[in-house]
UniProtKB/Swiss-Prot annotation:
HAMAP family: TSR3. GO terms for molecular function: 18S rRNA aminocarboxypropyltransferase activity; S-adenosyl-L-methionine binding. This is 16S rRNA aminocarboxypropyltransferase. Its main location: cytoplasm. The keyword Ribosomal protein does not apply. The keyword Cytoplasm applies. Pfam families: Fer4_RLI (PF04068), Ribo_biogen_C (PF04034). It catalyses: an N(1)-methylpseudouridine in rRNA + S-adenosyl-L-methionine = N(1)-methyl-N(3)-[(3S)-3-amino-3-carboxypropyl]pseudouridine in rRNA + S-methyl-5'-thioadenosine + H(+). Aminocarboxypropyltransferase that catalyzes the aminocarboxypropyl transfer on pseudouridine corresponding to position 914 in M.jannaschii 16S rRNA. It constitutes the last step in biosynthesis of the hypermodified N1-methyl-N3-(3-amino-3-carboxypropyl) pseudouridine (m1acp3-Psi). Keywords: Cytoplasm, Ribosome biogenesis, rRNA processing, S-adenosyl-L-methionine, Transferase. GO terms for cellular component: cytoplasm. It comes from Methanosarcina mazei (strain ATCC BAA-159 / DSM 3647 / Goe1 / Go1 / JCM 11833 / OCM 88). InterPro entries: RNaseL-inhib-like_metal-bd_dom (IPR007209), Tsr3-like (IPR022968), Tsr3_C (IPR007177). It is an enzyme of class 2 (transferase).
Length: 173
């Protein structure tokens, strides 16, 4: 697989406005024009990849991210409310494999990634490593996430499909 891809993948955030604006990674990404914020589900692009922790299929390099990647930046209660609306959008639901958070709030906790970390992980796995590094470069703790997860991210990025991702993940859990 290529070390990096030439064009950046569009990144989208459904932002419910429920977080501390000073700590919100989604808002910061939007300020740096790394992602677009949406406050309505109906405005999200169709056919994109939705990073969904409850998805049956793991994100893998076999997925086509050209239509973009979507992250939900909201509470779990809000997720339950919006999921019926999300079903109408024809999105590709994908779960991220095992990784540790590098952010100060959840440092070292498995699966507790914030929006920026979720995007960086997805981009890295899909082969867009430079874009992943660009996202993380905007946060003073961003290097921690990439360093903590360098080995699994490299392995995940070599997988052929979702099944291989799950196999690789089993070595880290």
């Amino acid at each position: 697989m290529n070390q990096t891809k030439s064009r950046d993948i569009p990144l989208y955030i459904y932002h419910a406005g429920q977080c501390d604006p000073k700590k919100c990674t989604g808002r910061k990404m939007a300020r740096f024009e790394l992602a677009r914020l949406y406050d309505r589900i109906s405005r999200l692009p169709r056919s994109a990849i939705l990073l969904d922790p409850m998805a049956e299929k793991a994100l893998s390099p076999a997925d086509d991210p050209k239509k973009g990647i979507i992250v939900l930046d909201c509470s779990w209660e809000e997720v339950e409310r919006v999921f019926p609306e999300l079903e109408k959008l024809n999105l590709e639901h994908r779960a991220l494999p095992y990784m540790l958070a590098g952010n100060p709030v959840n440092f070292g906790r498995p699966f507790k990634l914030n929006s920026a970390e979720a995007f960086a992980a997805a981009l890295y796995i899909l082969g867009y490593k430079e874009q992943a590094e660009k996202v993380m470069s905007k946060f003073n703790w961003g290097h921690s996430f990439l360093e903590l997860n360098r080995e699994p991210l490299e392995e995940y990025s070599t997988a052929k499909n979702s099944t291989e991702i799950v196999e690789i993940q089993s070595h880290y859990i």
